[in-house]
Every structure is written in C-alpha cells, then in structure tokens.
Amino acid sequence: MAQQGSGYQARYKRILLKLSGEALMGSEEFGIDPKVLDRMALEVGQLVGIGVQVGLVIGGGNLFRGAALSAAGMDRVTGDHMGMLATVMNALAMRDALERANITAIVMSAISMLGVTDHYDRRKAMRHLSAKEVVIFAAGTGNPFFTTDSAACLRAIEIDADVVLKATKVDGVYTADPFKDPNAEKFDHLTYDEVLDRKLGVMDLTAICLCRDHKMPLRVFNMNKPGALLNIVHGGAEGTLIEEAQQ
C-alpha cells in the first residue's frame, strides 16, 4: 500500500527513476528476485504516499545481454529488439509487484504490444502521472542503438520530470570503479561537461548530452541503501548530483 509520508515536504513533484535490469537480480546470477521487486515496490509506494509522481524505466540486462551474441555475429538491430523485449518483461514484473502493494501502475511500451501493454503516448502518460499512478516506460526508445539510460533521460524530458534518479550498486560517481580500485574517490557534485571531459562512465554520451541540453538534473545513488530514495526526494544529498554549471 502507498504509505503516507512523515510530514516532510517533498522537494520533487515528478521524478523519473531508472533501474538497471541487474538490480532486479538481487543475489541471483540471472532473472528476477521477487524479494527485490517487493522492496522496490515498497520504496516507490512511499513516494506515491507523499504525493510524488513516479515514472520508471527498467533495463533488461538481467534477462538478455546482446554484447556476447553481437560479438558472435548476431545482427545488432535484432539484438537490440530482443533487449527491448527483456525490458518489457521486467516492466510487467514491476507492475505486478506494485499492484500487489495496492499501488496503481501502468506499463507503456515504445513498441506496440496489443493486449500486453499500453502503447507509449506522452499525453496519456502525463494524465496517469497526474492521477498519482506509477507509469513504467518499457522497450527503451523503441529504436535500436539507443540505451535504456538514453530512454530514461528522453522520457524524463518528455514528461517534464524534475530530476532523473539513476539507481546503481554504488553510492554515486567515482573517479574509478570502487569495486576494483580502493583509492577511487567519490564526487558529491559534477557538471555535465565534467562528466564528459573526465569520461566518467555514468551514462552513455547520448544520455548525458540529452540531460545537458535540456537542463535535466541527474542524481546517481545506491538503491540498495534503505531509505535512500525517500531521502533524495526529501532533499537529502545521497550519491552524486550532476547538473549544469552554476553561473
């Protein structure tokens, strides 16, 4: 059930939450961990309970990785289409978890899947969000050669979100992979150009440039930290904030 907030005023009215497909695996090596789904549904429900409008984009890497097949000769476009279908599967699983928690949710796919999902329509998505329904955007942009990170930034701009929240396994952006380099240092704040100049692997170039060109703030945080998502929405300084340079 969408839980009521603790009285704090939410900093953001509408957010776009980007989850990687790998995040749904939990401790598994493949697929979807139901416990992770339920926990994420609970955290999203907390946001809905304090009046925050939530759009979701989920990757598909827990179900399909096209890189190995592409290296073996598979056509890139075919691989990307398979990846889009994986994101739809994750979106349906998340919708089910939300509905079991009594949170109204809808899946809107960029590729037509009549009888399975709604087709993406910006105006309808905005109406669902305004009605406090969670909208899960599936199938990326509907085009090959674009990542789900790019899709998340594109949808955030289209629905006029206040911020893109990218959930990862680490608590922000580092100078290097903190799992591999113990001396890696965390950034609390970056500009889009600093991310591009330093070649930091936050998102792909297209996604970062989309955010920069449309002045869409981006925060990278650790979804595995309990309460981190709610803290961000209340204005907390979790993870790393990426935005335009202050004048």
Swiss-Prot record:
Signal peptide: none annotated. One of its GO terms (molecular function) is UMP kinase activity. GO terms for biological process: 'de novo' CTP biosynthetic process; UDP biosynthetic process. Pathway: Pyrimidine metabolism; CTP biosynthesis via de novo pathway; UDP from UMP (UMPK route): step 1/1. It is found in: Cytoplasm. Its EC number is 2.7.4.22. Inhibited by UTP. The keyword Transcription does not apply. GO terms for cellular component: cytosol. InterPro entries: AceGlu_kinase-like_sf, Asp/Glu/Uridylate_kinase, Uridylate_kinase, Uridylate_kinase_bac. Coiled coil: none annotated. Catalyzes the reversible phosphorylation of UMP to UDP. Belongs to the UMP kinase family. This is Uridylate kinase. It comes from Pseudomonas syringae pv. tomato (strain ATCC BAA-871 / DC3000).
